[in-house]
A protein has these predicted regions:
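Extended, compositionally biased alpha-helical segments that mediate assembly or anchoring
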Residues: 1-67, 72, 265-364
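Extended helix-rich, non-globular scaffold segments
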Residues: 192-200
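A structural signal for well-ordered alpha-helices, especially hydrophobic packing surfaces
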Residues: 61, 65, 111, 164, ...
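Short glycine-rich, low-complexity/disordered patches
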Residues: 26-30, 70-79, 173, 184-185, ...
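Residue-level signal for secondary-structure boundary elements
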Residues: 69, 165-172, 176, 215-226
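Extended oligomerization regions of viral-like shell subunits
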Residues: 202-318
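Assembly/oligomerization interface modules of large self-assembling protein complexes
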Residues: 51-136
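Long, contiguous amphipathic alpha-helices that act as assembly "spine/axial" helices in icosahedral shell
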Residues: 122-192, 332-335
Length: 364
């Protein structure tokens, strides 16, 4: 059996990196071709007299694994709701300035020149609040077994990639789809109580409501952001609006299943070929424990219509480290994922729910 094209590419990329960084790996390990045997490739790596080659292999493998995990993670269905990276600091000061109010022109108003016109400025502080690590332990036995065949080596590398990627993907997916639920529970998002969509007719009725709000959100209004709801008495209302290309729909799969694709396409003026990226279908809006039990019930939420800016998500660190433990001859690989995962009180956003939140807090 010979190595697959993908495996050849990955292994030869590792060798190229060794040449670039001047390590000894490329001096012992050959270029992999269709006719290279696993013995020719693996023997220099697992040679007990040349442990530095194995160490180089692990270091180079870490880079290949990281590249694969990074590419897959940042191409996940909800990844484009994330903002720019946040390289420094732990907090972001997010500011919104209300539109200036007009005043009538008066040719005799000389005193107005010295009058102070205060801008209405709203500020929210968002913090880095998710610092997670995903770990994989590699034993000497696993390495030896990996070099018994090309298929075993490919399975070994794929297993590491999938373990780290799946862990990060699941957490990121749940964090993103959990933001509307978190805001709903906190009284920090507008909502409307609807009839539970159980058939095509009730599902279409929901879409009609959303279509009306989709149009209204494009006009300056104080009706679709939660700033005043959260800040309470004494605060000022924010006048906000959204460009149509910035409005997205997040809908539960049970409701989406009741609708024809054309219904969503027509309702939100989206070409069928461009529905992905504007309409996000999620399994549901609940949050779950590791054993599958419900941690936070979000089953009452059926859909969300919001500006993309509602999702205040930024990655600060996404990197890999490794540690060799000679005591038990294992190698630990760590994927570090540090992020800010918050929602905005400035953004137009609305939840469509079959029940009031606890506690209740909407004027919709």
């Amino acid at each position: 059996m010979y190595p697959s094209t993908g495996l050849q590419t990955a292994l030869n990329k590792m060798r190229e990196m060794s040449v670039d960084n001047g390590s000894i790996y490329h001096q012992y390990v050959p270029v992999v071709t269709e006719s290279t045997t696993i013995g020719e490739f693996g023997q220099p790596i697992i040679d007990p007299q040349n442990v530095n080659v194995l160490n180089d292999f692990v270091g180079l493998l870490k880079k290949v694994v990281y590249t694969a995990v990074y590419s897959k993670t940042f191409n996940s269905p909800l990844a484009d709701l994330e903002g720019d990276r946040m390289p420094l600091g732990n907090f972001i000061e997010d500011v919104y300035v209300n539109p200036a109010k007009a005043r009538g022109f008066n040719v005799n108003d000389f005193a107005g020149l010295l009058q102070k016109y205060e801008a209405q400025i709203a500020t929210q502080y968002l913090a880095v609040n998710s610092d997670l690590q995903y770990c994989v332990t590699i034993t000497r036995d696993k390495i030896r077994n990996a070099f018994t065949s090309w298929s075993n080596l490919e399975a070994f590398i794929t297993g590491i990639v999938n373990s780290l990627y799946n862990g990060a993907y699941i957490t990121r997916y749940n964090q993103t789809k959990g933001l509307p639920l978190a805001a709903f529970k906190a009284g920090a998002i507008k909502y409307e109580v609807i009839t539970n969509p159980t058939d095509e007719a009730t599902a279409k009725a929901l879409v009609r409501k959303m279509r009306a709000d989709y149009t209204k959100m494009q006009v300056p209004s104080t009706a679709f952001n939660a700033w005043n709801d959260v800040k309470g008495a004494g605060s000022f209302a924010l006048n906000t609006w959204s460009d149509p290309e910035d409005l997205i729909v997040m809908i539960s799969s049970d409701v989406e299943a009741l609708l024809d694709v054309d219904v969503l396409s027509v309702a939100f003026n989206i070409d069928r070929s461009k529905l992905l990226g504007k309409i996000y279908v999620v399994s549901d809006f609940s949050q779950y424990n590791e054993d599958g039990t419900v941690a936070v019930d979000g089953s009452m939420i059926k859909a969300v219509l919001c500006d993309k800016s509602f999702f205040k998500i930024k990655t600060q660190d996404f990197d890999m480290e490794d540690f060799r433990n000679p005591n038990n001859r294992t190698i630990q690989m760590y994927l570090n994922d540090t992020r800010m995962v918050n929602y905005s009180l400035f953004a137009n956003a609305k939840v469509y729910t079959t029940a009031e939140p606890t506690p209740s807090g909407s004027d919709s």
